[in-house]
Amino acid sequence: MAFAETIFEAERTSTAPDRATLRDILRAATSPDHTVLDQSMAGLRLAEPADLVRFLGIHLAARAGIECWLESNALPGWVPPVQTGPIALDLMALGGLPAAFPAPRFDPGAAADWLGVAYMIAGSHLGNRLLLAQAGPALPDYARRFLAGNAMQDYWRRLRSLLAGMPGPDGGESAISGAKATFGHFARCVGMFRLSQSAAA
């Protein structure tokens, strides 16, 4: 199954432009970004321990900077739950943490709205149950904190109340900017991880 359909919520609905919610607009605007990230992760097989460690390492590096930015820029009470802690603990359990590279800084630009960033980071957690099934016995019980966690799914259910509203005066452009910057940040982390793996080979 494609990365965009397992990591991100698969939705095939259409909405009339005059009734499009912010969620509709974000989903349509970031569809190409879904595809790019899907393709960049397509070679990972989570049933293989080495690929599982790579997958978690990419998420640790990408989410660290994003979480730091959201802590300072999201509305009070709307900061997504921290995932870097569970990921790091899982990597330690799998013996993969020493291979992680320093997390790059996340800077979506002054025009970015935190809601677009939160949309991507929360939506990316929705397919974790499917990924957990893909990993199978390769992922021991003591290393399932990230994929089996419920905190981000609970946050997504709350976030949908904001995403269900109509876009603001800018037509959702600031939220789109934030979401696209977040996708781009993840894609760069995938590239950095590949370079680090090639150098170590």
Residue ranges and their predicted role:
Residues 1-201:
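Metal- and O2-centered redox machinery and metal/ROS homeostasis
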